Swiss-Prot record:
This is Peptide HSTX-V. GO terms for cellular component: extracellular region. Residues 1-21 form the signal peptide. Its main location: secreted. It is found in: Secreted. It comes from Haemadipsa sylvestris (Indian leech). Expressed in salivary glands. Highly expressed in the head, body and tail with a 2-3-fold higher expression in the head. It comes from the Eukaryota. The keyword Disulfide bond applies. Residues 22-27 form a propeptide. Keywords: Amidation, Disulfide bond, Secreted, Signal. Does not show effect on voltage-gated calcium channels, potassium channels, and tetrodotoxin-sensitive sodium channels. Does not show activity on Nav1.7/SCN9A, and shows very weak activity on cation channel TRPA1. The modification Methionine amide is found at residue 47.
Length: 48
């Protein structure tokens, strides 16, 4: 039961993050608040 609850919470979190990403399209790297790079209106996290 706990595993199902964790899975549902993670699914909701991912859906919210995807929704926010589509609503707030970036125009440059400053729109990503230093957490990533803007590419075609979407902020991608910086790895490494």
């Amino acid at each position: 039961m706990r595993t199902l609850l964790v899975f549902l919470l993670l699914t909701i979190l991912v859906a919210v993050l995807i929704g926010n990403n589509q609503v707030e399209a970036c125009t440059n790297n400053a729109d990503c608040h230093g957490l990533g790079h803007c590419y075609r209106g979407t902020c991608f996290p910086v790895m490494g």
